[in-house]
């Protein structure tokens, strides 16, 4: 993603909706920083889906639950993210409830999930960091 918005009007917005990409999720995707909270990680993962950054998705998915194929549907058009809640259970466990809106083939959809995260190393010898474990889909309200 470039650092300019439309017609050079300023920094490109972050897909997660929380600021400029370069200073929001971009710094995580480039490896300049690690997301400090489960919510920041979840936002960075949403942005990775929007941008097709499969490498970031794999790096931030817990090894015990990461599927072998993370290829995205190229026909998916992500429209926006709303974080409904972020709860810290203890120092190493958190949940984030969110709604992601998207279109496939012109039809609008919503992904409403309560995601679980752990703070640990993905590989032996790595520093601990937030990792996505799994989530429960929520029914539309």
Curated annotation (Swiss-Prot):
Pfam family, one: YchJ_M-like
Gene3D superfamilies assigned: 3.10.450.50
Record-linked InterPro entries: NTF2-like_dom_sf, UPF0225, YchJ-like_M
Similarity comment: Belongs to the UPF0225 family.
NCBIfam families: PRK01842.1
Protein name stated in the entry: UPF0225 protein Rmet_0111
Protein's organism: Cupriavidus metallidurans (strain ATCC 43123 / DSM 2839 / NBRC 102507 / CH34)
Taxonomic path: Bacteria, Pseudomonadati, Pseudomonadota, Betaproteobacteria, Burkholderiales
């Amino acid at each position: 993603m470039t650092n300019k918005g439309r017609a050079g009007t300023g920094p490109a917005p972050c897909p997660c909706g929380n600021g400029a990409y370069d200073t929001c999720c971009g710094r995580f995707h480039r490896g300049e920083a690690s997301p400090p909270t489960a919510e920041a990680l979840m936002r960075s993962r949403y942005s990775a889906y929007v941008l097709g950054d499969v490498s970031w998705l794999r790096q931030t998915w817990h090894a015990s639950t990461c599927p072998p194929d993370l290829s995205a549907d190229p026909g998916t058009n992500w429209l926006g993210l709303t974080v409904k809640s972020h709860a810290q259970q203890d120092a190493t466990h958190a949940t984030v409830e969110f709604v992601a809106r998207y279109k496939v083939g012109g039809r609008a959809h919503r992904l409403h999930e309560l995601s679980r995260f752990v703070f640990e190393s993905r590989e032996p010898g790595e520093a601990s960091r937030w990792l996505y474990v799994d989530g429960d889909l929520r029914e539309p309200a």
